[in-house]
Amino acid sequence: FPRYQIGESMVSGMAPLMEELGLVAELDARFQHKSGITLRWGKDPEPWRSDFSAAFSSTGSHFTHAWHVTRSEFDELLLDNARSLGAKVHEAAQVTEVLKDESGRTTGVVYTQGGETHRATARFVVDASGQGRLLTRRLTQTSWQEDLRNVAVWSYFDSYTPLDHKDDILVEAIEGGGWYWYIH
């Protein structure tokens, strides 16, 4: 950490969790606010909008926005926060084996770090490896649903002409199939 990942615009529902983790002030200081989402979808060419503050207030929440984060910074912020809350963090480690109990439940891993082999067990084992799918690859055979084998392409643009709400996420359907997600 940090390591490069494509940026992320968080969904507004993440705000209460970020508050529970004590990260709202840090997120507000470091990352761009997203006030809503504008969509251009279906047969109607006119865009429509969902305002995050209105959505939050309808649930009794005090939040007004979500964030667009730089993933490398956000991931490091989450890792450091977990460490400060007492999580034992192992970096530069390689999982070599998944441990299971007699019933087949995953109970831990064997990993190498600094040339030494270690064993870690826990009541809950969480695979936070993202698209790497470390545990999935070791525990199950991946099967793909053929009609959902999609392709994603990403790029950065130097400039654009925003719609009325420049801090919104923009999602637009593309004629003939597909869509794009634009984050300013």
Language model region names:
Residues L23-E26, L77, N81, L85:
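Generic non-transmembrane alpha-helical segments
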Residues I6, T70, F74, E116:
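Conserved acidic
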Residues F52-G60, R123-V125:
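A short, sequence-level motif marking secondary-structure junctions
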Residues S58-N81:
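Short beta-strand to alpha-helix junction loop
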Residues R3-E46:
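N-terminal FAD cofactor-binding segment of flavoenzymes
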Residues D80-H184:
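Predominantly flavin-linked oxidoreductase catalytic cores and closely associated redox partners
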Residues Y4, W67-H68, T112:
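A generic secondary-structure micro-motif detector
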